[in-house]
């Protein structure tokens, strides 16, 4: 990576064929999951006319994802990781086929949608954990920042494209097309993933899966560095739940339906800019301090967001949050991979991802509770400034993370 450039270097896709295969598979997978994400709530709403039933499907899938992340972490540290990834993807695709066949029935089964949602949520997260644990072996630990930034861009781009395609398919062909193409896309991802090298876990003594998972918890709690990173990640995810207040704040700002879209687009746009301008992050001598400060800045942006007199200024605050949270997330990802022993990578990645999932749910619940007692403006500000106070305390308490220093990676000729 060129020291003189702030821009992200994409050369990793050229120099590392295995990472290129993962990049391609991940992009196709994100688009496929996006088609599914549009179709499931629409189908349930059409069948039941109940937002509660739609919410139940999201909750069940989220619960299955949490369990899948826990189980996937243990499996990724115990079995050959490539096999775990392929098994999870293939099994997930079978669930999508089930959703497609159910949608083609004269009277689709609501119970089948719920059960297949549990199936897909579990196996999708199983593969995610194994892939995260395998990444250092695919790109080398010195390239993790670059790999994380490219991955973030992939996720953001796919998240923008897939709902648009999903909406067009719903308008022209119905939900069965969404499910069918999601299944096809998932099986297509197996082709590039088959080219991956063998990814065996490091040798370690066999133990009961629950005991193995508890060992991961103990490592997380015993390590001030890794535990602090995970804690910051959870708080940052809680802050992103501010999106539940967008409709109410839009009324406060008297925004049109078209303008509300800017609120939802602001954070992904800011995050994409953060990933694109992450060229120098890997060369930071004090990544822990930078992570803490960028996290504090993101909380401040949320606190100021609801106080803005004009919606356009609120959008700027959200974009700033997206940028700062991207910086913090990239540093979290890189430090977590480099500071975790190889034998623990599956479990720690599973726990880190799981706390992100639960952080979002907790943040949404807290904001919903605040919204019942306060105005939307007060709720947004209270959440942002409350997290800012907690962040300042963590800045003082997490001494090892704050003082952590690293030797910046050497610049190679291919990076210049």
Curated annotation (Swiss-Prot):
Keywords annotated in UniProt: Cell inner membrane, Cell membrane, Membrane, Transmembrane, Transmembrane helix, Transport
The gene coding this protein: entS
Major location (coarse): membrane
Function: Component of an export pathway for enterobactin.
CDD domains for the chain: MFS_MefA_like
TM spans (from-to): 22-42, 56-76, 84-104, 110-130, 157-177, 179-199, 219-239, 257-277, 288-307, 314-336, 357-377, 379-399
Lineage top rank: taxon: Bacteria
Membrane topology type: Multi-pass membrane protein
Protein name per the record: Enterobactin exporter EntS
Gene Ontology molecular function: enterobactin transmembrane transporter activity
Cytoplasmic topological intervals: 1-21, 77-83, 131-156, 200-218, 278-287, 337-356, 400-416
